[in-house]
């Protein structure tokens, strides 16, 4: 089964399962949030679903409630960190800069950001 094999080899699935340690800042039955190992801003954490989803490109209708929960968790965690302005980033596919094939959202804050991002 491809899904099972992907999740067994996935570093984010291993973090979600507690097999790899992380600086967890939030966790519930559906998702986990943890500080980025290589922060690009004073505050930089990732929010991921525990379910293995490769990227936004592989979502289906059954994932809509999960995605809403992730967005609400991002809102709460930003407020918990007193972020009035922040950036949420997800990369899709290799050309989009995705390096871990598990859907994840970077939340960056604590400094001013500019556009274009590059």
Question: How should each PLM-predicted stretch be described?
Answer:
Residues 1:
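Glycine-rich phosphate/oxyanion-binding loops and their immediately adjacent helices
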Residues 4-118:
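HIT superfamily nucleotide-processing domains
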């Amino acid at each position: 089964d491809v899904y099972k094999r992907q999740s067994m080899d996935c570093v984010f699935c291993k973090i979600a399962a507690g097999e790899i340690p992380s600086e967890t800042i939030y966790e519930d039955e559906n998702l986990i949030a943890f500080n980025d190992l290589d922060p690009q801003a004073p505050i930089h954490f990732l929010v991921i679903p525990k379910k293995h989803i490769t990227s936004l490109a592989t979502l289906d209708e059954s994932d809509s409630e999960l995605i809403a929960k992730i967005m609400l968790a991002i809102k709460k965690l930003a407020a918990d960190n007193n972020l009035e302005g922040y950036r949420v980033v997800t990369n899709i596919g290799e050309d989009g800069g995705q390096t871990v094939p598990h859907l994840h959202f970077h939340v960056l804050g604590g400094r001013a950001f500019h556009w274009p991002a590059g």
